[in-house]
């Protein structure tokens, strides 16, 4: 990758960081204005999320506008003029170097390339990269940073609506006893985006692991299904979540998933569970 491309990526990253700082300052004054009925911590998190969303919108606008330093091209048009190999190098450089991550316009530009070529590239990066610190072959590198290349490729696949790897991704995810939260989040984004493909696979994984208490990555699988169910509720999803609630060792996760799903039938289940906890606590006391 040329120094020119690196300099352009760094400049847009610096601008993105400034936009985020401005948005956080803009919304920072509202953090103390907690609405009645809300707790301060949740409201602060909400305000920060809003600031980040506004930042992303501003960055997308910035990346689509003509830039004199790019010869009148927008950043997206600049990326479109590059070869796929150059884009791949830029994606990996951005993923591990830039504070703001890979530009959305670069993700979109790669996603518009020849489908098979992009699919092969993403498959190689996702398959060959470490998903745990133990798998990282270079101990001088930071796992969280190196994993960003996997996340970036998953983002490309989401942009392409290419979900042929859902089964393989979930098989590998389930092979670990435990993963970092940022790994689970990136997998969730891909799996939830592929709802029509993912639902039967997720339900099957849950059913296969009921007797083991749905611990470790199985907890994340239940969370993924619940999130899909929020947007696409169905009787099959509810029944699977109900079975998961009864089987999960960590009932807190189960309660959260049922609550997020939003089915009225979940309320008695949660009430009965809470009542049992109170009864057990009183008995032990």
Predicted feature residues:
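Short, intrinsically disordered, low-complexity segments enriched in Ser/Thr and Pro
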Residues: 1-26, 82-125
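Secondary-structure boundary/capping micro-motif
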Residues: 1-60, 78
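Charge-rich, solvent-exposed alpha-helical interaction surfaces
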Residues: 8-11, 78, 121, 152, ...
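Hydrophobic/aromatic-rich, well-ordered segments within soluble, folded domains that form packed cores
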Residues: 52-69, 264-267
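Charged, gly/pro-enriched flexible loop segments at helix/strand junctions
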Residues: 63-82
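Amphipathic alpha-helical scaffolding segments comprising HEAT/armadillo-like alpha-solenoid repeats
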Residues: 84-92, 114-139, 160-174, 196-209, ...
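Structural detector for internal amphipathic alpha-helices that build alpha-solenoid repeat scaffolds
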Residues: 92-113, 137-162, 171, 181-197, ...
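Ankyrin repeat arrays, specifically the small/polar loop and inter-repeat linker segments at the C-terminal end
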Residues: 177-178
């Amino acid at each position: 990758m040329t120094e020119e491309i690196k300099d352009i990526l760094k400049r847009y990253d610096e601008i993105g960081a400034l936009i985020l700082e401005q948005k956080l300052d803009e919304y920072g004054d509202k953090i103390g204005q907690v609405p009645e009925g809300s707790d301060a911590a949740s409201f602060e998190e909400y305000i920060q999320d809003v600031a980040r969303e506004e930042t992303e919108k501003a960055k997308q606008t910035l990346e689509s506008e003509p830039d004199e330093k790019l010869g009148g091209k927008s950043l997206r048009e600049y990326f479109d003029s590059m070869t796929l190999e150059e884009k791949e190098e830029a994606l990996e450089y951005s993923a591990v170097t830039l504070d703001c991550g890979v530009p959305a316009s670069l993700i979109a530009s790669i996603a518009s390339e020849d489908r098979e070529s992009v699919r092969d590239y993403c498959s190689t990066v996702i398959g060959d990269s470490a998903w745990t610190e133990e798998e990282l072959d270079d101990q001088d590198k930071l796992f969280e940073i190196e994993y960003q290349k996997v996340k970036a490729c998953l983002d490309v696949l989401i942009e392409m609506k290419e979900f042929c790897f859902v089964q393989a991704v979930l098989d590998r995810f389930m092979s670990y006893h435990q993963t970092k939260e940022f790994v689970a989040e990136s997998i969730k984004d891909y799996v939830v985006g592929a709802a029509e493909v993912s639902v039967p696979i997720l339900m099957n994984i849950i059913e296969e692991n009921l007797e083991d208490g749905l611990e470790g990555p199985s907890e994340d699988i239940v969370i993924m299904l619940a999130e899909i169910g929020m947007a696409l509720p169905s009787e099959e999803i509810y029944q699977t979540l109900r079975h998961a609630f009864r089987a999960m060792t960590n009932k807190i996760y189960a309660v959260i998933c049922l609550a997020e799903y939003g089915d009225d039938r979940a309320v008695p289940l949660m009430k009965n569970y809470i009542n049992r906890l109170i009864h057990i606590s009183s008995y032990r006391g």
